Amino acid sequence: ELEPMVTWGITPAQSIRVSEKIPEINNFYEDDRPVLAKALEYMDVKEGQHIKGLPIDVAFIGSCTNSRLSDLREAAKVLKGKKVKVKTLVVPGSQDVRAQAQKEGLDKIFIEAGAEWRFAGCSMCLAMNPDRLHGTQRCVSTSNRNFMGRQGSPTGRTLLMSPASVAASAVEGKVADIRESY
């Protein structure tokens, strides 16, 4: 069984299994350590800290890469009958995906869980509209990249996860392991 992954840093390469602790930078090549130290500082996490349980402010299920119909179905399975604890945006990858999701009633599951059901578009992935992080908010996101300033705030922090993992984290209000109770 594959274990869910989550990014702890500012690139997709800075990722760990959800059950792991954030790595010690001294375990990396000396040339890599300054970038890793910068990532730790920016993301406001510590070496040896568990990633699971890290509080979040926002959950984003969207982007053209991770909000296919199959992704939305997986997220809906997690959210059905539950309530999110943080602001949660669900943005289908296309208008066709949105229409099919609505035919299947997925929109109702998201709305009943307390998530915002949106039209297809870039939304928080690009932050080219009001859907953006503010200040040092931490967001679990299904987008495919993270870097400093991602999602519209120069100090906002993005952790990449699968759609089901983002949904579970939204319910718990912190980084969650989808395998534990969903």
Residue positions per predicted region:
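Fe-S-dependent hydro-lyases/dehydratases of central metabolism
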Residues: E1-Y182
